[in-house]
Every structure is written in C-alpha cells, then in structure tokens.
C-alpha cells in the first residue's frame, strides 16, 4: 500500500511540475558577440543554463563542397563550453544554426540529389562530432529573384530527405534523433516566393518565424522593428509588416501553430529624422548613430537603449502595442517588458509553440539598465512559465524534490526561493515541492530559475585599475578568472573541473592547457 501511495504522489508531483513547460523558449547566441568591447562581450558560459529550453549557436557555414564548416577561428573551443551547459541542465537542448546572412551556398547545395546527400551526411557527422542535439537551417529567401524558381520545391525535397536520413541514423545508432528545425522569414513576399508552407512543416520539429526587422534604416520613413499589429498610420504596403499577420499567414497556409516559434528581438532600430516630425511614418534620412558596443548604425542592443531613454520622449504606438522614443533627430523603435507581456499573451491566445530570442547576447547581461540580468529573456521565461534547470528525481531519491505540506500554506501558486538554502527552491502547486538546483547553480528570485551565482567583488579592488574591460585568468588559480568592468574588479569560479583559458576567454576542460594559455 505504501509503495502504491508513493507512486501516486510521484505521479502527482510529475504532473504538477510539467505545468507551464509546454512552451519552448529558444535563445540564439552569436559567435561574433565575443568581439564586442566592454559590457557587450558575451561568451557561451555567460548563458544561464536553465533560462531557455533550447540554445542555438549561430552560425556554421557551408563550404564549396557542400559540407559544414566552422566560421570563427575558435568555434570548436566555443562549441565545448556551449554544449557543456547541458551538464548543469540535463533538460537543455543545444542546436547549431546553419546559413545566416550569406546563404549563397544553399543554391548549389539543393541543386542536385548528390549535393544534397553530401550536405546531409556532413550535417549528421558535424552535429554528432561536436555534441549538439540538433540544427537550425536558416535560409531567409529561397524565392529571391536571384535564385532559380525551382529552389522553392528543392527546399521541400531537402527537408524530406533530411527527415528520412535523421530517422534512419537514429534507428541504426540507437541515439536520440537529431532535431531538425529552421528559421524562416516573416515577409509575405518571401513566404509566397520561397516556401511550400503546406508541405515543409511536416518534416521539421519546429520553425522559428523571424518576426522582426519589419522596418529599419533601409526605409525612407520611420517604422517599428517588430510591431504586433498593423496600424492605419503606416503606408499601405506595410499592412503585412507585423507579427500578427506574419504568424497567421504561415498558419493559414498550412504550418501547424504548435510548430511555430515566434521571434522576440532584444534590440531596437534607429532612424535619423529629416524634419521636426517625429511621429510613426515620419520621413527619415537614414540610420541613427551606431551603438557604443554593437558598432552598427541604425541598430542598438537592449543594454545600449537605456542611456538614450533616460531623457527621451517615449510614446506607445497604441494600435501596434509597442513603444518608440525620440530625442533630437533620433527615432528609436524598440521592445520593453510591457510589449513582451502583450506579445506573449497574444502568442498564448493563438496557441503557438513558444518564443525565440534574437539574441540572448543583445540582452542586458550586466544589468547595465538596472533591470536585472538578461531582463527581456528572463521576462519571457516567467511569462511562458518555464522552470528549467531543476533536478527532477523521483520523490525520496538523493537530491530529489521533497514534499513539505506546510511551507506553501497561505501562499499563491508559484515558485519561491528557500531562504535557508541558496541552491534550493519551493514549488507551490496545490502541494509543496522542495527542489534542488543542478550542481553549482543557485536559485535566482528574479528569474524564478536556477542560474550561476552572482559575480563577487574581488578583495583586491584595484586589480583592474589599469586594465581595459575584459576577462583575465587568475595566475594563481586556474579555475578562477577576473572580470574588469570600468576598472571595477569582479571574480568568478569556473564550474567544477573546468579551468579558464585566455585564448577563448572561457572555462573549459583542462585539455592541451599549454597550447591555449
């Protein structure tokens, strides 16, 4: 009888813990974020391993023999630290993005069965070699006027062949099937010209719809980067340039809603105004100034926005449910906590499969804007009710969740930190579940998730006085490193068993240490 009761309690716990975990939160990391200066620098180990359900590393390229190749000199090193995040969160899935901003190689790759077979075999070997769980195919415009019209059907054929090959490989090796996903455009013109929507969805695990970059400095008028809805204030051609139309268009043409992941940008786009008119649709002379860290005109990361917003005029585009700000000749369209909340409610109402962030490295890692660490991504985590990164053993097992009927009395349903144990938390869901974070993680009350401990001040506070912003190895302890931010000194420990390498500015396994010092 006791065993039966224990099993019933265990099943209840599992069912309670699964509440709110049906949505995906997919976070892209770009391999050029490592080159940004100061607070803009972002490495794989900066990613809280339990904030997102899936992480995507961008990008790998296709060479002239139709095989995958790395893009950056240290990609192979970064792959290790990226995939090592799964050791802190066994539920996490990692994927590799293929393609990107210059996907010309796709043209010849899809052109023949032989080329497609070479590509497919290369993908399988590459993904298995580096320890990813899947890949994300990014081809923004297969229907471009520069491309042959056959590419529309060839993309579907490639998807069909990929699905078959991945199923066969999994069956032969006994390994979990490699996840096959893609990121496709939100433009009606590109969808019509390049995609057999009613066919291609059946072959992929999910599709990220890039619901951003609807407007930017390429326009001669101001417009929001990622509006939720259309507005009568915009030009007629812009009626299609919003999240709601794009997502419904994919769905209404045959893509299942549950396979559709909606894009949320962590950046804004700027314009230089032509006149004193600063309204939506006002004449624009070009891009706004470059960001201090991202360095590209017309484009600011979220952590670059706050200085501008301090004394800017902020207005809400009521029909589109998104804010914009103006100061002098600069017009900025961006997203904030409120617009994310509105968009997530719309996402839930339409029963889409989840959200993806482009990109986590453009979010505010260092709480520069005083809203917490990675505030936009954390907001999505909370709104989608994702609780990743927990130890979910059977009740009664070592390090597993325990039941304490009294702790949640008079508390609302939700997740609470354990005031007596930083690595534990309570899940109040009709019953009380007392859980552990994965090893080396602590519970963060802000994101309601398990994450890395906060950076600690170093006792030698003058260590960074003469040093530029960046990461530095502790010469006396290989598993520690310093972080210099505006001449302030912080230090952190690498995860257990790892050491810090100057070459990649990352924590990694102590292999070939002398080569990377």
Predicted feature locations:
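Active-site groove signature of glycoside hydrolases
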Residues: 123-150, 213
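Glycan-binding loop/region signatures in secreted carbohydrate-active enzymes
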Residues: 28, 98, 215-236, 264-346, ...
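Conserved, mostly hydrophobic/aromatic
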Residues: 55, 96, 137, 162, ...
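Cleavable N-terminal signal peptides of Sec/SRP-targeted secreted and luminal proteins
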Residues: 3-22
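Short, acidic/polar
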Residues: 35-49, 113-128, 188-199, 243, ...
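Cysteine-rich, disulfide-bonded extracellular modules and peptides in secreted proteins
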Residues: 389, 397-517
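Substrate-binding surface in catalytic domains of secreted glycosidases
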Residues: 65-76, 142-307
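Glycan-recognition patch characteristic of GH18 chitinases/ENGases
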Residues: 19-127, 152-153, 161, 371-396
